[in-house]
Amino acid sequence: MLDLKQTNRMLRKLERFVDIIEPMIFEKVGEPGPVSAFATLERFHCIPEDSLFDPIEKGYKWGEEFGYCWFKTDFVVPDGLGGKDIFIRPHISGYEGTLWVDGVPYGNFSTKIVFTGHGNHYCDLLKKDAKAGEKIAIDLEYYAGHSYKGCHPTENNPLLTYDFSYEGIDICVKNYAIQEFYFDLRTLVQLVKNLPESSFRRASVINELEKVFKEIYQSPDDVDRDEFMAALERAKPYLKKALSVKNGDDAPKAVLIGHSHMDTAWLWHVGETVKKCARTYANQLALMDEYPEYKFIQSSSCHSDFLRRKYPDLFARIQQKVKEGRYEPNGGVWVECDCNITSGESMVRQFLWGQRFTRKYFDFTSNCFWLPDTFGYSAAIPQIMKGCCVDYFLTTKIDWNDTNTFPLDTFYWEGIDGTKVFTHFNRTHIWPDAEDLMTYVAGTPSNDHSCIKDKRVTDTRVISYGYGDG
């Protein structure tokens, strides 16, 4: 058995090992055919015609403020990849991008938010259960971004550059063994970091991690690939044993659902919001193809109407997922509205137009006023909600207070006329992993002020995970 100093050193090495194997989840197996590009300032809502594209090579430069660049290619599935899930990883710099597969928007790429050395959504599903000989049409739409001086008066916002480049496209497969080991080990390392040192659970996890540490190689460069993978396989049972321990019935619970908050008009033109909605919601459908258990909630009927008008094929696919009960168009209002200076009539119209749209196009009546991103709340909201057949209220930012903290996160809110609505504060901008769930649900030794406030009231918290704004 290791002493305390040795144990801490082992845990640091395992934490580093998590970062080492993360890039190994996707393995390059090829490249697509010749690539052509088309740079433009025009906002297209469909793929531009072929005559506008010119052939390019690696090193191609593009970019100007408010500019877009489209990249066109295809990939023929070789016999060796038949029956496998195929992924695509572009090496294209830019602010954000959309993946189109066989003529329809199917995913998004984000380099603006960096995690583990690369942007989020850096490698997207291209084709589920691909067929040998199948030709896949690939179009990539990238946005260069823009400056927004003056939005933050205290910030010195220098002139941005838009010098972007194309450095190739990789076709990849996923190493599911690496992925499983990565998430299992990451979960257990986070548990150890956030449980009290006096915890018996923590001690039992450390015992299993010590066995894992003795089996694995610290770097894939230490041995050949087969031996590296064999070592992971030998260590796997110890991870599974540690993860098999269940919490008791009185343990707190987290309700997880995917969500991408979308500002209708903030640091960009509304026309760009339309494209943000397309790439974001298309990506949710791709995630549903990859993960059958995945569910997503979208607020703001206005955003659905953007897609109905500009991306009708994508809108039809969303309608199908709503029928399946996997895509929930629940928010109650037309847009997530201001609640400080708006009039009562205006708020009623928000619910009227929001409910009218979801009933007409999704056969869905919203039961929740989903409003995570507002900075104030009219005392008339409960009365207006109930009058519009909306029973539940969810918000977030009042729970960010660090000076006069709000004492509850689940309660009945009573309005000016005595009307009550069931209210819950969720948490956003977090990962659905062990560290964040412990922090915002149960609490940790280093953070006991972000968790469920009054544990006599509830043992459950909603966690909506995912990044927003396209």
Where are these regions (language model features)?
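Short beta-strands within extracellular/lumenal beta-sheet-rich domains
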Residues: K61-D79
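Intrinsic-disorder/low-complexity, polar/charged segments enriched in Ser/Thr/Lys/Arg/Asp/Glu/Gln
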Residues: Y68-D74, D85-F87, K135-A137
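Solvent-exposed beta-strand/loop surfaces of large extracellular or lumenal domains
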Residues: I47-E49, F53, E57, G94, ...
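Short Pro/Gly-enriched beta-strand edge/turn motifs at strand-loop
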Residues: F53-G59, F393-T396
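Short linear interaction motifs
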Residues: L52-E57, F71, G80, R234-K240
